[in-house]
């Protein structure tokens, strides 16, 4: 009885945390976007077996009509996104570089309007949406110091590393954090600042 109760509580906690993880994502092109974001560590959820409940796969239709299957933390993030966030993300991309696992273990799915990334494919790993001007700046190839460089690396393979938050907004400034820095975009001045 005690073990069954613990399992039910653990599954409920994991579900609640998964729903909280996605609060506050916004599209840089929208003037009526939400003003806050919440980051919650999935490590806080636990079940009696020590692992999070399995995440149900999500199937989407790409622009070319093919089916794209999201799994693990990418599926959890997409499933918990608001309808506005899903609309802003748009259709999933297909083809080379559109989805997969990077050399550093980061899992990702590119969309017309953004990307969802997670540090690894474990179901309990939080995933984040990066989009707009911040996504564009994150994808710029950079050297280890963060300066743009033709022979550098961009995105999660670059010096900023993987996303560690959804976009937050304070006034006209939107910010996304990464393992080794942050990117801000001011919608009033159109200025992007990268800090590594």
Place the predicted regions along the sequence by residue:
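Extended, compositionally biased repeat/scaffold regions that form elongated interaction surfaces
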Residues: 4-11, 15-196
């Amino acid at each position: 009885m005690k073990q069954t109760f613990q399992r039910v509580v653990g599954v409920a906690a994991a579900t609640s945390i998964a729903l909280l993880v996605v609060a506050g994502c916004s599209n840089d092109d929208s003037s009526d976007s939400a003003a806050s974001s919440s980051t919650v560590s999935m490590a806080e959820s636990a079940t009696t077996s020590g692992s999070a409940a399995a995440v149900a796969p999500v199937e989407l239709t790409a622009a070319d009509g093919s089916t794209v299957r999201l799994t693990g933390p990418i599926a959890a993030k997409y499933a918990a996104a608001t309808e506005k966030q899903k609309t802003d993300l748009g259709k999933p991309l297909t083809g080379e570089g559109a989805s997969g696992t990077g050399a550093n273990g980061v899992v990702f799915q590119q969309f017309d309007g953004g990307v969802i990334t997670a540090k690894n494919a474990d179901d309990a790993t939080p995933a984040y949406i990066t989009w707009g001007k911040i996504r564009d700046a994150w994808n710029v190839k950079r050297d280890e110091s963060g300066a743009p460089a033709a022979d550098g690396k961009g995105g999660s393979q670059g010096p900023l590393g993987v996303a560690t938050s959804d976009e937050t907004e304070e006034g006209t400034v939107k910010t996304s954090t990464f393992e080794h820095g942050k990117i801000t975009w001011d919608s009033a001045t159109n200025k992007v600042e990268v800090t590594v």
